Amino acid sequence: TGDSAQYYGCITEMDEQVGRLQAKLKKLGIYDNTLQVFCSDNGPEGNDPDFGDRQAGVTGGFRGRKSSCYEGGVRVPALAVWPGQIKAGSVVNSAVCTYDYMPTIAEIMVYQMPDQRILDGENILPVIRGEADRTKSIPFRHKGRAWLVKGSYKMIINSITETKSDEIYDLSRDAYETENINAISPEL
């Protein structure tokens, strides 16, 4: 009922539309030569004054929701399908970012950016294929906070506008961000 019904209705509609797209690609004979990528919006709404009392959506137990710097607000599912290029059923546990899409597509198309333009992201096709790890850090800034993901570590910089201490989490051991290791590992 209410927000939950709308939320799950949107998921059902999205599934139907993805099915229509795939059927059309197959009908046109270009399904096997088309990279399809799907990524959801960041975090479900709720527990934030900007969104009222709406609570639809789940974080899978991750801390935080939309507008939060914690994994429940920024970790989202992404799916990539490209027959013959990406192994079906493979799982990638490396963090990537939507601004990685542009350099990845440019690489696939063998396209050189004009004027040696530098892009923030990186080509993530080797990451998706399981051939390499991400090389660049992922920086974010939102609502007076900043955070940086490098490898399995995530640093949340609260000191920009707050007096709270900064936080560091090892997401490979603590994806739910329950143990701030900043005090015990300040060298990170």
For the regions a protein language model found, what residue spans apply to each?
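Secreted, luminal/periplasmic, and some membrane-associated catalytic domains
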Residues: A23, K27, N33, G73, ...
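Metal-dependent active-site segment of extracytoplasmic phospho-/sulfohydrolases and closely related
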Residues: E13-D50
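Conserved catalytic motifs of the protein kinase core domain
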Residues: N33-L35, Q55, R75, K164-S165
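Structural helix-adjacent loops and short alpha-helical linkers that scaffold large soluble proteins
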Residues: K26-I30, M113-P114, E187
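C-terminal cap/loop subdomain of S1 sulfatases and analogous C-terminal strand-loop tails that border
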Residues: P44-C69, Q85-S90, S94, T98-S172, ...
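Hydrophobic/aromatic beta-strand patches that form the interior of the parallel beta-sheet core
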Residues: L35-V37, L79, Y169
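The substrate-binding groove and active-site-proximal loops of carbohydrate-active enzymes
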Residues: G2-E13
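Active-site-proximal N-terminal segment of extracellular/periplasmic enzymes that hydrolyze or transfer
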Residues: E179-P186
